[in-house]
From Swiss-Prot:
Annotated PANTHER family: FIMBRIAL SUBUNIT ELFA-RELATED, TYPE 1 FIMBRIN D-MANNOSE SPECIFIC ADHESIN
Gene Ontology biological process terms, A to Z: cell adhesion involved in single-species biofilm formation
Keywords, sorted A to Z: Fimbrium
Highest taxon in the source lineage: Bacteria
Name of the protein in its database record: S-fimbrial protein subunit SfaH
Pfam families hit by this protein: Fimbrial, FimH_man-bind
Family designation: Belongs to the fimbrial protein family.
Function: Fimbriae (also called pili), polar filaments radiating from the surface of the bacterium to a length of 0.5-1.5 micrometers and numbering 100-300 per cell, enable bacteria to colonize the epithelium of specific host organs. A minor fimbrial subunit. This protein is necessary for full expression of S-specific binding. S-fimbrial adhesins enable pathogenic E.coli causing urinary-tract infections or newborn meningitis to attach to glycoproteins terminating with alpha-sialic acid-(2-3)-beta-Gal.
């Protein structure tokens, strides 16, 4: 006589794609629409919109539980500009822990209804470090990684499983804290044919209250001195990149540049864009394109 054993598995689903999984690594692509909360935190990920799970025990005798494990948190790149928080939204009084987690959470979420998809009730928040504004997240960046453990009332009979959920941004995210603002989140500068230039970069900043403001450039660089940003154009010109300069000269990547005291009147960064030789290859014809990030800080 043949018979089948009931399944004690927990099945989860990527709500965006419909992909189902019961363990292992899963990636989520998220269009991030940050919402500033009353406590100045920024809501980044609502897991209830992204992940659902269901109990697969048709007998109703086995409850599954999920808990989030040590090491879960935002990506290291975000940790340098912000700190994070995880909230379980199903708790009446709330349950919050700072990220990255330093220990496995004892709070669990139960899944006991057979065949019923239940959203995972948690949200991830960012708290920008004081003085940080500008672009914080780039399209394609890893936002956060959650390590999740599934266990059951039937113990090992029902199987213990581990998940790794990785969330990637599908858009750029800018933070405007309400204290200082930039004139544009995206500035396109068209250079004339080589060797023409330089061309003014129309970018200003202003603050609600007078602050000491500085900015830092970042992006792929080439050559010595970190002042020539790499040409990222497909089939682009060789031996040449883009350089941003102010009245003091070329601005290196990764080194803060002070704008002094900035108040309610817009202050220009005073930047000009020009071509610059990399010194690493012969000059060859082609397109030139560089993407340069500007991050502001104030105190």
């Amino acid at each position: 006589m043949a018979y089948s054993q009931p399944s004690f598995a927990l099945l989860c689903r990527n709500n965006q794609t419909g992909q189902e999984f019961n363990s292992g690594d899963t990636s989520f692509r998220v269009n991030v629409s940050p919402v500033v909360q009353y406590d100045k935190s920024i809501s980044v990920l609502d897991l209830s919109q992204l992940v659902s799970c269901q109990n697969e025990d048709s007998t109703g005798q086995n409850y599954d539980y999920l808990k989030i494990l040590k090491g879960s948190g935002f990506s290291p790149a975000l940790d340098t500009k912000t700190y994070g928080r995880l909230d379980f939204t199903s708790r009446p009084t709330g349950y919050a822990r700072q990220l990255p987690l330093q220990f496995d959470l004892q709070v669990t979420e139960a899944f006991y209804q057979y065949g019923v998809w239940k959203p995972f009730p948690a949200k991830l928040y960012l708290y920008p470090e004081p003085g940080v504004f500008g672009k914080v997240i780039n399209n394609g960046d890893l936002l956060a990684t959650l390590y999740v453990n599934k266990f059951s009332t039937k113990g090992q009979e029902a199987g213990e499983r581990n998940f790794t959920w990785r969330f990637y941004a599908t858009n750029d995210v800018h933070i405007q804290t309400g204290t200082c603002r930039v004139s544009s989140n995206n500035v396109k500068v068209d250079l004339p044919s080589y060797p023409g230039g330089p061309v003014t970069v129309p970018l200003t900043v202003r603050c609600d209250q007078t602050q000491s403001v500085s900015y830092t450039l970042s992006g792929p660089v080439t050559g010595s001195g970190n002042t020539v940003f790499a040409n990222t154009a497909a089939s682009g010109a060789g031996g040449v990149g883009v350089q941003l300069s102010d009245k003091a000269g070329p601005v290196p990547a990764g080194q803060p540049r002070s704008l002094g005291q900035v108040g309610s009147s817009p202050v220009s960064l005073g930047l000009k864009a020009s071509y610059a030789l990399t010194g690493q290859a012969s000059l060859t014809p082609g397109a030139v394109q560089s993407v340069i990030n500007v991050t502001f800080s104030y105190n």
